[in-house]
């Protein structure tokens, strides 16, 4: 009985160690990520510090949006790791109070493919608001994705001037 238990524990720990080692080493294997040229990301977002805070004092808003990223470099700035670089653009509709504000960001997206299930990214850039309020603002984001498959991922983006959660489709 003890021999069977020991064999099962050994087999389970071997499988877990091999799986964990694969996940750890993926970042060190350039090019080991889904093959795509465009990432389409519909999302919901919470914006804050919106321009045009009038008498209604609404500085935040909630709404739907879309981000599209075109992959520019398959093996990004650091050739020894699994990274890509793209240009991202979007359109977000925020409705703070009784007014509508649209946010149009343009960012550089630097992706780090950590494992077959996880990736992270940073996005510096800028954008402009228009609608009942208008203005120009810097944009800084950091985010992560949980990949259900090579084609679909759950995406979380945190930064300034908004937070977003959505689904990424790698086309």
Task: Identify the role of each PLM range.
Residues 36-38, 58-64, 98-104, 118, ...:
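Residues that define the transmembrane beta-barrel architecture of outer-membrane proteins
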Residues 21-74, 93, 160-161, 168-171:
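Short glycine/proline- and aromatic-enriched beta-strand/turn motifs that initiate or cap beta-hairpins
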Residues 1-33:
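Cleavable N-terminal export/targeting peptides
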Residues 89-117:
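Helix-adjacent hinge/juxtasegments
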Residues 24-37, 73-85, 98, 113-119, ...:
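Short loop/turn motifs that connect adjacent beta-strands in outer-membrane beta-barrel proteins
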Residues 42-46, 64-70, 91, 106-110, ...:
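Residues on the lipid-exposed face of transmembrane beta-strands in outer-membrane beta-barrel proteins
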């Amino acid at each position: 009985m003890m021999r069977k238990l020991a064999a099962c524990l050994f087999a389970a720990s071997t499988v877990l160690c091999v799986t964990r080692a694969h996940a750890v080493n993926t970042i060190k294997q350039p090019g080991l990520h889904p093959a795509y040229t465009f990432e389409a990301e519909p999302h919901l977002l919470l914006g804050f510090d919106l321009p045009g805070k009038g008498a209604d004092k609404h500085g935040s808003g909630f709404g739907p949006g879309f981000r599209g990223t075109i992959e520019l470099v398959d093996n990004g700035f650091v050739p020894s790791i699994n990274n890509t670089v793209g240009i991202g653009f979007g359109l977000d509709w925020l409705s703070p109070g009784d007014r509508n504000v649209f946010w149009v960001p343009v960012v550089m997206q630097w992706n780090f493919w950590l494992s077959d299930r996880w990736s992270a990214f940073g996005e510096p850039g800028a954008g402009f608001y228009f609608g009942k309020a208008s203005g120009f603002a810097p944009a800084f984001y950091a985010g992560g994705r949980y990949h259900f498959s090579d084609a679909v991922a759950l995406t979380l983006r945190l930064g300034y001037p908004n937070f977003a959660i959505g689904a990424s489709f790698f086309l």
